[in-house]
């Protein structure tokens, strides 16, 4: 836990207290989960920045969150839906990851995801016949994202305190690199 706090202070400086409020730990056992959550949120922040840049350039962008928890050795993954966990689903590849055991729900998720990806590759738009509508992402406020879980659903993508934190952290990093 002490290393986690020291890392936050080293990486975020005057923003460390905000980071530690957003990703609190009470014991060493909490550290891996909070590190993983912070990593996912930072990736989310980056993804949304790219989507906004695409929209500003007049291009279409589609964002998603993968929340489906796969089974590993017959049990839900204790790490949850982690970064890159969606790869075997987007390619409809049930043998994509070692020890992954697929259920009927997994097969449905993979079929829908791979259809979205194939549509996007062919047309630049993930939407297609029989799939829930995936909205374009246009701005940090008011846009909606596709949540790819046990069943796809669209949710608001309003800025959260975590996204605001990463905006401030990156601005801080840019300022320090120009000094």
Positions of predicted regions on the chain:
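Substrate-gating cap/lid region and adjacent catalytic-acid/histidine neighborhood
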Residues: 1-104, 116, 123
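Short secondary-structure transition/capping segments
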Residues: 63-66, 110-115, 173-178
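Short, solvent-exposed polar/charged micro-motifs at secondary-structure junctions
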Residues: 72-77, 142, 156-158
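Short, flexible active-site recognition loops that position polar ligands and cofactors
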Residues: 102-103, 107, 156-160
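Non-catalytic, well-ordered alpha-helical segments in soluble enzyme domains
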Residues: 106-129
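Mature extracytoplasmic/periplasmic domains
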Residues: 123, 127-156
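Tryptophan-rich aromatic "cage" segments
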Residues: 151-179
